[in-house]
């Protein structure tokens, strides 16, 4: 029993403690009541004013708790003459509002039921009315009291929830009889039975107020009146303290903002605008009932401090811990190779010998410089050498390893470690490094321009992001080198002699400078479908060689170098030849046999006979027709060998063409991700390609799903076969195809920024003229490369050019033939429109339109003109005007590409040279040339705005595509067209228009606006 009693006692104690905590918790958030007037428990005379005298009686009664209290009573129902109404007023003393904006009143009262009073005639009430009146000063004693209703503002009519029967069986005309205070026998209920009502009124604006109660025929007793205002209590939350705040005077739905103060070592949270630290102070809102709500913002602990006691305080990080940014996260241990010797550390300093780069975040570990590179060696290549080395043993804990090469020229043989001892000096300017001398990412460099038989010391330094912070010089390794010019020069060209399905015979002339007796030649070859590092070599003592064991229908690259007693010379340029498809007979090119070593008379006779035979065959073929009558189209260039472009449409089976011209990819290596656009054959998706043993790369994937027509499949694969034949830094690269399973897929490199036209429209005015020239130069270089294969693009436009994250422009949509002459009419040359004849010259015309698109930031060529209007303008030899801000030199180049006579248009190599000159000498962009040397061409005017339909500068800005400045115009009061027409270039920065492209565009349209207003005679400009 004792144990049970103890347990019960413990439970009661625990319950009391829990209740106490709940009470404390609730009291911390409950509203505060500031009392303005309270008659509860009053036992002495209150002395409020009544009208008429005797209408209300102040008496002492027992309340519902049997406590004696002063009350005001009115009960004149039974004694009133029949047909007369009651109008009894009771007014409080003057009540100071003490800063309250709204007052609340809580009434304790009792009402007798009319049915218990025996009163008839409708003069009995069970309600009374509550009023209030504001005043700056209390009423003077001698002032005439006026109870006129106009002086009072009604609060509400108060009705009892319960009315009670009379305490005696008979009614009385006196209130004292109705509310008699007398002895009560045992068991009899004493005191009054009460109703409690609460009302509020406001807003209060004067010094104080009176409250009045109007009785119109009730039998009631006012037991207690409590006037008070609500106040939100002082509170601490979100690391901010908020002061005690008066509730709003407009009622429960209105809010009063309170500004908080951050606790020690805390700061306001960011506003979310621009990510700036140190936002606005936090705010909490007090409603009309004295309750906090709607928190805006807050505070957070400063760097080096973490939350404590929930969200009430910020304490310093202990030693060994740190916090780098403001926020409410806890402190963290110091990163590797760093420490925090003092409390409140925002960052951990690095240990001696270790550093943190300026770009490293505070949470990054401290790192050190790398050790020296290892195992330097070199290969002599004529007057140049290829220097190799291995990675340092220690990388310092970083991944941004770079290499610098230091070159020293010495007078005699030097040891690398000696540093020259004063006999070595920096290499001459003629020595050059490929790709560069400093900041190398690969462990090799080609050093050229070295003098023969001169000793050099090449030193390779290993550096990373913290090397500059170290007081010690970078760790380096050095090697002695020497070169000789006695090796032969490069073999200038390689020719194909014959080919079969599994072999190719090639020949070549001697180097221009043999520099001694040629001992032999080394031929290097590789399959174009494979990586160049997987090449093979063979040695020939003559200037001809046959390569066997090749794959049918594959394209191979060839290079040759000669060897003398001094060593190998450099390789010559690469040329590409293709083996015959399986089953075709060996192809001989006798006209090339003149290059085969041998001069006997029988060979000469054979050459003569073969030449006559070839001429006859060529003559017959020309008579039968021209065009793409062979699978293999060739273009000869002196000194460059033979270039081939294979038309896949000549294959009966498109899959055979794609297998010969592109690399097949296993679908298991492909991961398809989200949709990034729409192509000619459906959705284009981003994906990942990771062949076995190779690095993963992002690709664009276009798939042709099952059910497509055979002609659609041929077109789909044919375009990939065309793209796979070209390798150029400004042409979209084909990564592979999937033809052995479904769906068919074509994989190309991923171009992050999409088509050039939409890219420019999204970044209008953000590039300099030279940057735009560089973009055009890249496209022109790609077209020069394509034209060297006699390949015609047919649909060149800014939309057919893609842009990657490095702003490199790459030509795409190869093999996408326009569907009819009206397609892409805005980019088509006159001969294409008239006869459907596509040539490289027509591509030059289209390139000129592309130039105009670039300089206008993706503007639609010929604006909103209809296709018939465009056709008429071209036939009448009208040409596009320069876009706003376009340098004259660039527009003249556009006009050259739009020559009606296609023979007078420049070639792409001339365009590339012109762009190179502009980049080297930017002043040539502004050169207009001699007008007399150029044909006079009429220029189109942009489609004029319909000014009568534009009712404001805001609408005008929208019409010209600059609606982003509408708020700027409104802010500076530019409300009429006359105001806008007065603007000049100097005014635009003040309006917030700082982009050069936007300034030029706006000034151009202001000139058009001025012309319109001159015609209307409404403004002087």
From Swiss-Prot:
PTM entry text: Ligand-binding increases phosphorylation on tyrosine residues. Phosphorylation on tyrosine residues is mediated by transphosphorylation by the catalytically active EPHB1 in a ligand-independent manner. Tyrosine phosphorylation of the receptor may act as a switch on the functional transition from cell adhesion/attraction to de-adhesion/repulsion.
GO biological process: axon guidance; ephrin receptor signaling pathway
Membrane topology: Single-pass type I membrane protein
Localization: Membrane
Ranges for region Disordered: 163-182
InterPro entries for this protein: Eph_TM, Ephrin_rcpt_lig-bd_dom, Ephrin_rcpt_TKs, FN3_dom, FN3_sf, Galactose-bd-like_sf, Growth_fac_rcpt_cys_sf, Ig-like_fold
The Protein kinase domain, residue ranges: 670-919
Domain comment in the entry: The protein kinase domain is predicted to be catalytically inactive. Its extracellular domain is capable of promoting cell adhesion and migration in response to low concentrations of ephrin-B2, but its cytoplasmic domain is essential for cell repulsion and inhibition of migration induced by high concentrations of ephrin-B2.
Disulphides: none
Signal sequence extent: 1-31
Record's keyword terms, sorted: ATP-binding, Glycoprotein, Membrane, Nucleotide-binding, Receptor, Repeat, Secreted, Signal, Transmembrane, Transmembrane helix
Ranges where the SAM domain occurs: 948-1012
Function description: Kinase-defective receptor for members of the ephrin-B family. Binds to ephrin-B1 and ephrin-B2. Modulates cell adhesion and migration by exerting both positive and negative effects upon stimulation with ephrin-B2. Inhibits JNK activation, T-cell receptor-induced IL-2 secretion and CD25 expression upon stimulation with ephrin-B2.
GO molecular function: ATP binding; ephrin receptor activity; signaling receptor activity; transmembrane-ephrin receptor activity
Domain Eph LBD stretches: 33-237
Residue numbers on the Cytoplasmic membrane side: 616-1021
Protein family: Belongs to the protein kinase superfamily. Tyr protein kinase family. Ephrin receptor subfamily.
Transmembrane segments annotated in the record for this chain: 595-615
Tissue distribution: Expressed in brain. Expressed in non invasive breast carcinoma cell lines (at protein level). Strong expression in brain and pancreas, and weak expression in other tissues, such as heart, placenta, lung, liver, skeletal muscle and kidney. Expressed in breast non invasive tumors but not in metastatic lesions. Isoform 3 is expressed in cell lines of glioblastomas, anaplastic astrocytomas, gliosarcomas and astrocytomas. Isoform 3 is not detected in normal tissues.
Residues in Fibronectin type-III domain copies: 369-486, 487-582
One GO cellular component term: plasma membrane
Name listed for the protein in its UniProt record: Ephrin type-B receptor 6
Biased segments, Low complexity type: 166-176
